[in-house]
Amino acid sequence: MNIGVWLSYDGTRYDGWQKQGNTDRTIQGKLEAVLEKLEGSTVEVHGSGRTDAGVHAEGQVANFHLAKSMDPDGIMRYMNRYLPEDIAVTRACVMQERFHSRLNAVRKTYRYQIETAPKKNVFERCYYYGLGQELDVGKMEQAAAILSLIHI
């Protein structure tokens, strides 16, 4: 059975989405470890995209196949019980067998946040880039005009 899950995570403590041989601090690795305990065998989790180290996600879709037939809500409760507190499954459902979260993705939204205050907010430092000065909107508009002419 093909299960789709919607995820939110604070990526501060992680080395990105993709499982890596030199670290167990990845989102994919944490998900697969929990699911392997549930399934009793290896489970490969496919994400709709890969985030870099320290990057957060809200509403990221992933999918995985289980040999056992299980209730999606039960899977979600199990995962949330055993995942670290900075990773949450917010929704789970049975998907069509051919569904693949990356190949069937229709949209991704990225949000970049810049803090322009001269002093950093220590409680939000992981969620903003601390520039420490006002943005020069005129220069940004000039750069955007140049970039709009470049075709890659």
Q: For each predicted feature, which ranges?
A:
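Structured-RNA-binding interfaces characteristic of tRNA pseudouridine synthases
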Residues: M1-H151
